């Protein structure tokens, strides 16, 4: 297999377990480990995760330099907010290539990935070029090797005037939330078993699962009892149910929950124990709301503040770039993510967690959740200059008008204790403590 490219790129180095290979001028060849180590050390080379590549070759993780063109950084810049496993194979999968197996195939795939991503920048419309152009001059000054290649294809008129400031002031381009009139009291209509199983059938068809699943239908029917109107004030209906792995519990309770929310004009809170289960419920919600824009409004994930990007922390780190105490490239890639993220969740959302580990960057300079979320309870709320664009505040307000809110037990309990919220919260609890374990 050969590759033709009109971009002036260095050769691509792949070092999976079992061998090393280099793709140069469209053809790949095997390398010994010493040869690969020398090429990596001398550069320039294309790599996927410079830190891991160095460790496989027995070298120290390098500082960011023009010798190492990390295609993962290019991916984070061109396709912000999209998931990618941090390997050549991961890049190949997300870009639609055949998954490479050998080191030769991975080196070719890495070169193809860089070429495809750069070709996407050449096809951007003016709006996309302007959004990226705010950051590219600053990235070029910081020594990011892809910056000059991308800028070469940009008309000078598409580089915004504020690009000279580095473009890291991403808070200035975020939309603000607006207060809306409070909702009235929720309705009290119940959900019938027929409504729940009908909704379940719709969701299974959307998920491509057309076979009969009587156990899952029975679970969905049982869950409807949690939505019966209260007979006595402050005594909600409670259903304690258990089902084995593979039954399909998530869609089993999302089906009646979504019907209840639609009929009664109020959100249903689904509480779970772990972030992994929150992600799973959110993923399966794709069958409930296939359209991403509708899903963003109808299904909201709620977590504690320590999970979300704090714009004030980000601003403080961005100001450190001029002093040389912050990672300019990492912050620029984070700025791209801020413009594309669904909800600003850095710990389990769409933030590429591998960004801080690609190169040797001091911990206090990294664009990482450790530095960019509020872990010390120092939020000043309405006194913050970014209060109107705050991701947490947007999530709070979005949850009020959603149909399904996916939260964790800690947030739900604190929410109930301090705000006395009265909403229906079904939980998937295989033990009396209400904890979810799988």
What do the PLM-derived regions correspond to, one by one?
Residues 224-228, 250-264, 284-288:
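Walker A/P-loop NTP-binding motif
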Residues 2-3, 115-190:
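Acidic two-metal-ion nuclease catalytic site recognized across multiple nuclease folds
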Residues 187-241:
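Conserved pre-motif I regulatory segment
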Residues 9-121:
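Conserved DEDDh/DEDDy metal-dependent 3′-5′ exonuclease domain
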Residues 62-79, 270-275, 294-311, 429-438:
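Conserved beta-strand -> loop -> alpha-helix junction used to position metal-binding or nucleic-acid-contacting
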Residues 190-201, 267, 272-403:
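A substrate-engagement module of RecA-like helicase motors
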Residues 386-396, 409-433:
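Conserved RecA-like ASCE ATPase "motif II neighborhood" in helicase/translocase motors
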């Amino acid at each position: 297999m050969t590759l033709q490219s009109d971009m002036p790129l260095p050769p691509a180095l792949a070092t999976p377990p079992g061998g090393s290979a280099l793709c140069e001028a469209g053809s790949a060849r095997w390398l010994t480990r010493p040869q690969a180590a020398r090429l990596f050390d001398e550069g320039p080379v294309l790599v996927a995760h410079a830190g891991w590549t160095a460790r496989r070759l027995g070298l120290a993780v390098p500082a960011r330099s023009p010798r190492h063109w990390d295609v993962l950084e290019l991916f984070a810049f061109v396709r912000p907010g999209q998931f990618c496993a941090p390997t050549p194979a991961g890049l190949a999968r997300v870009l639609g290539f055949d998954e490479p197996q050998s080191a030769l195939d991975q080196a070719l795939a890495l070169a193809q990935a860089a070429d495809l991503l750069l070709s996407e920048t050449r096809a951007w419309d003016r709006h996309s070029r302007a959004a990226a152009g705010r950051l590219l001059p600053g990235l070029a000054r910081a020594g990011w090797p892809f910056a000059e290649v991308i800028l070469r294809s940009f008309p000078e008129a598409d580089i915004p005037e504020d690009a000279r400031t580095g473009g890291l002031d991403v808070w200035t381009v975020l939309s603000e939330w607006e207060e809306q009139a409070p909702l009235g009291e929720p309705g009290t209509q119940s959900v019938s078993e027929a409504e729940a199983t009908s909704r379940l059938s719709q969701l299974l068809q959307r998920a491509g699962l057309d076979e009969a699943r009587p156990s899952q239908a029975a679970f969905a029917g049982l869950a409807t009892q949690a939505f019966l109107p209260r007979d006595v004030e402050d005594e909600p209906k409670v259903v304690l149910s258990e089902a084995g792995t593979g039954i399909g519990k998530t869609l089993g309770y999302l089906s009646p929950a979504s019907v209840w929310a639609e009929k009664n004009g109020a959100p249903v809170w689904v509480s779970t124990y772990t972030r992994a289960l929150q992600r799973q419920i959110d993923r399966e919600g794709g069958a409930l709301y296939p359209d991403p824009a509708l899903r963003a409004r109808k299904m909201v994930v709620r977590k504690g503040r320590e999970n979300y990007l704090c714009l004030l922390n980000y601003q403080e780190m961005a100001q450190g770039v001029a002093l040389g105490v912050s990672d300019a490239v990492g912050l620029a890639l984070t700025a791209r993510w801020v413009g594309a993220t669904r909800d600003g969740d850095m710990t389990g959302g769409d933030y590429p967690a591998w960004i801080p580990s690609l190169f040797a960057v001091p911990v206090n300079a990294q664009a990482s959740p450790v530095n960019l979320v509020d872990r010390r309870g120092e939020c000043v709320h309405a006194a913050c200059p970014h209060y109107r664009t705050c991701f947490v505040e947007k999530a709070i307000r979005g949850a009020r008008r959603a149909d399904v809110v996916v939260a964790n037990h800690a947030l739900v309990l604190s929410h109930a204790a301090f705000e006395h919220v009265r909403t229906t919260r079904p939980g998937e609890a295989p033990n009396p403590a209400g904890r979810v374990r799988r």
